Amino acid sequence: MTELTLRPWQAQAIQKAERWFLELGNKHFLVNAAPGAGKTICASVMAKRLIDKGEIERVIVIAPRREVVRQWGKDFSDVTGRHMTKVTGADGDVSDFGDDLCATWAAIQALSEPFQYICQNFRTLVICDEHHHAAIEAAWGEGAGGAFANAVFSIILTGTPIRSDGKETVWFAYDSDGKIDHPEEGTFTLSYGEAVDRGYCRPITFHRHEGHFTVTLPDGEGIAVSSQQKGQIDQRYNDIPGLQRALDFYKLACAPQYKPDGATPDPASFLGTMLDWGISKLDDIRDTTPTAGGLVIAPSIQIAEHMAELLEEMTGERPAIVHNQTPNAESRIASFRNNDTKKWLVSVAMISEGVDIPRLRILVYLPYAKTELAFRQCMGRVVRSLGADDFSRAYVVMPSLEVLEEHARRVEEEMSPQAREEPQHTFKVCPICEAQNPRGARECSECGHEFPEKATRYKTCPDCEMLNPITAAECQHCGAKFAADFEITLRDALRMGAIVRGMDLDEEDVADSEEMAEDFREFILASGDDFLVKIMRDVPLEAISKITKFAEARRRKSEE
């Protein structure tokens, strides 16, 4: 059991929760704290206090995905000295698996009966991590309502207390702004801006990556598209299927482009120039934080694979890549977390929430859905501070899309003016002995380590033709905004539409599909039904959650 020194906010939250539970006689306490502020430790200490006072006998933790469940087991054991058993829906009756259990939200429906038995027969605390997963229209949200109805207490944790879809969740309603509606006395809130000012989170800078696309039609005519300009289609092209859908700035921004050989990813494409900015910024950060890494969030497995190939083409190093078809994905995440020399990790939705990789500093953000909930979750992967000596900053590279810019502006407004200013470091840190050296030093003054030569990368302003650093958002000489021009064929534009298949998925659909993909695949293959196997090949795995929700809705309707 680890002896802990609590952060002031954690001590305040614990004191407030104890009063809410024990003096005022309430059941549900909400902790709304910025990603990386320390919610897991806070809730574990709350649980230990209640155990020590004899108020509870057992603890059940529900977390968003398996990797987060694993982290919960470790942190809970470190704080309480009690073992927490990780259980899945395949385990059946888990009521005698141990005093303290941890499962994913997706497992609740299969485990609702044993969880209900535990809550009815033992004084049980339920800790709900990332509470937005508990939408009552989702199967596990409905299961949670019944399974945990008799829990003595529940602690609800969230770093993003917003649901853009307005769905009601277990225990809490949402107000007209999509925010959790719960009494102030039963809530502890620590905003991202407050967490930055207190040193719990890093300040963040957003790079809006603009681009102008020209979609070339078969007759040679071009249609201009940008984030500020929708593609205008002449009537004579109305018979081209899917053309209007293809002329979407975000779809074009995500479209893979290749060199003339048709196989090599093109570094001069929109995706390539986004990565170029991230690569250059990560190289700068590694001068002062030699272990820093970058994360790419892609909208689909196909694009994640393309981004990985682009990174390898541009850096000479194959990045780590994880998605629901990756063998031993959790082991790969753990390997990246512990391998300080590996610079980049590419994922679809497996790193979007709860996964703690403290060395991440750069996020290249190309999500499938563009909700504020998903935005703040992914942002949370790069803002976790390492403590008082962590002077680094977090960066997000994203397409210049209005909805993403609105999310970014709200985050920036939470930060103090001082936190928004980007400091200029005059030193670099030796990766061997960690000594600080002048930025221009060729070798470490302490251990003699030779710093590798780093070529400064520039781009030319199209207006004044002067050179600027590759990461500059505007010309340092004439002030012109940088927005590269990209040509893309109609075939490639339509191909992107085929990749995403025009399906209306949100980030939670994608995340839930990631969680259930393995079980779904095993079920289909075990059925021996060739037709179902063919459907599984044709339907994107990101859509599994949508399909199961449809089936559940049909079942309910037939029972009415």
Regions found by a protein language model. Name each.
Residues 1-32:
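Conserved pre-motif I regulatory segment
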Residues 24-46:
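Walker A/P-loop
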Residues 40-42, 55-78, 299-302:
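Conserved Walker A/P-loop ATP-binding site and its immediately adjacent core
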Residues 79-113:
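Inter-Walker segment of RecA-like/P-loop motor cores
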Residues 117-156, 160-162:
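SF2 helicase catalytic motif II
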Residues 166-291:
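Interdomain helical connector at the RecA1-RecA2 junction of SF1/SF2 helicase-like NTPases
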Residues 318-423:
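Conserved RecA-like P-loop NTPase helicase motor core
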